[in-house]
Structures are given as C-alpha cells and as structure tokens.
A protein has these predicted regions:
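General beta-strand structural signal in soluble alpha/beta enzymes
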Residues: 17-20, 71-77, 128-130, 140, ...
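Short beta-strand-loop/turn "lid" adjacent to the catalytic site in phosphate-handling enzymes
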Residues: 5-53, 79-90
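Phosphate/pyrophosphate-binding loops at sites that engage ATP/ADP/AMP, CoA/4′-phosphopantetheine
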Residues: 3-16, 116-121, 231-233
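Glycine-rich phosphate-binding loop plus the immediately following alpha-helix
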Residues: 55-63, 74, 89, 94-126, ...
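Adenine-nucleotide phosphate-binding core of ATP-dependent small-molecule kinases
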Residues: 186-233
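Short acidic/polar capping segments at secondary-structure boundaries
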Residues: 77-82, 133-136
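Gly-rich Lys/Arg/Thr-decorated short loops/hinges at beta-loop-alpha junctions or inter-strand turns
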Residues: 41-43, 88-93, 208-216
Length: 233
C-alpha cells in the first residue's frame, strides 16, 4: 500500500482518512462503518467469519489509523444484509436466507447507472445487478436498498463456485464421500465450477479451449452463462 501510494506521488503521512474494502461483518447496513479494535477482533476470530481477502483491507486501514491518528472505515462490506423479511424465509426454519457477498461492486454499479444513464436518484430506482467474478451473485436493489439476492453459493456455478445442487444429492455426498467438512466446502467454494470441470478459473483460457475445438469446454461455458441468466430472470 505504501509503495503504491508513493509511486503515485502520495505520501502516506499526507492521508487525512483511509477507507478499505469491508470484511464479512454479518448483517451490517450499507455505507461506511468506522474501524475499531472490536471490529478487528471479530474479523480475526475464525469461528465468526470466513477467510476472505476482504478481511485484509480493514486490518491495513486500522494499522494506518493507529500510526497516523486518522479516521478509518470500511465501505459496503460483504456482510451487508438489508434483505426484506419475506425474502429471508426458507423451507428449513433453522437455515434462514441472508445476504452476503458483492455489495461494494453491485451497489456502485447501480448508483453509477442511476446517475449517468437514468439521470435519477439511486433511491428512486430499481435494479437487478449481476456480479460475475470467481463467485457470482445477483442483487435486487429497490429504492436504494438491497432487498433480495441470489448469493454465490445458492445460484448457478461460476469460475470457482459449485453453485446450487439438489439437497438430497448434497446430503448423500457429504455422508458418503469420506471427506471432512473443510474439504467439502473447498469443493463447492474455491474448487468448483469452471475449476472443477476444466481445471482453470480463467474465462480467457476457456475461450481458447473452445476456439481449439473443445466441445466439452463449450458446453460448460454456455451452461454457466445459461444458469446466470436464469438467476437474473
């Protein structure tokens, strides 16, 4: 971070505030949230939060805050959850639905579209926004609030995620595969999707496979696009 700032002519000691990507703070509102020791303690407890690169942002920002005595915050954390009550209900009472994932990107794109394309305030618009990365999620924003979503582990597969599968098949796999919970989680969250089918998460490489005549790669790639389109619909 220091090298990046200095290479762009910005001295670290000239910062007046620092804002980072937010970690997996469960059920927080959108927007800016101040970073303090309690937040850092929560984000570093393995039983409370999943390991994710976004955790590093708050820790780096907190270090800069302490060193220079400046305000530090996270923004649109991946744990942002504003889902309406009716969307939280699942068919298994012990497992309610919730929002987690790509708030920072999807909300920014919705705000940008409202401002630059529709010329309307974001809080007067309704958007369906698709984030398509290593994991993919779909967000429904209504009047500035993310009222529903398709999380990256409950919709279609993506470059790294296994996506939704039949519950009977999943339960059977968990109890007959001989794998522990950590291994099964990795199969669905990190080693699934394109990675599992084609041994790569790079869509450019997949397109090269298709151009070279790999029919299986073509079917898998089209299946991913088809599934994401269904999630949007």
């Amino acid at each position: 971070v220091r090298e990046a700032l200095e290479s762009n002519g910005i001295g670290v000691n000239t910062l007046t505030a620092v804002c980072s990507r937010g970690g997996n703070i469960i059920a927080c509102p959108h927007g800016a949230i101040g970073i303090d020791q309690e937040m850092i303690d929560y984000l570093t407890r393995p039983e409370d939060t999943a390991k994710h690169a976004s955790l590093l942002g708050s820790m780096i920002a907190f270090d800069l805050k302490k060193e220079f005595g400046i305000p530090a915050c996270i923004y649109d954390a991946i744990g942002t959850d504003e889902m309406q009550a009716v969307a939280r209900v699942s068919g298994v009472p012990e497992i309610p639905r919730y929002t987690v994932g790509h708030t920072l990107n999807t909300r920014a794109m919705a705000i940008k579209c409202a401002d630059e394309v529709l010329k309307k305030p974001f809080d007067e618009c309704t958007f369906i926004v698709a984030h398509m990365g290593g994991g993919s999620s779909i967000r429904l924003y209504h009047n500035g609030v993310n009222i529903d979503c398709v999380n990256d582990d409950e919709g279609n597969f993506s470059p790294e995620r296994g996506g939704a599968v039949g519950c009977k098949d999943l339960v059977n796999y968990c109890f007959t595969s001989g794998n522990d919970a950590k291994t099964v989680m990795k199969k669905f969250h990190g080693a699934g999707g394109l990675k599992a089918h084609l041994s790569t998460t790079d869509a450019i490489e997949v397109e090269k496979m298709i151009d070279a005549g790999n029919e299986y790669a073509k079917v898998v790639y089209e299946a991913m696009a088809y599934g994401i389109a269904k999630d949007i619909a």
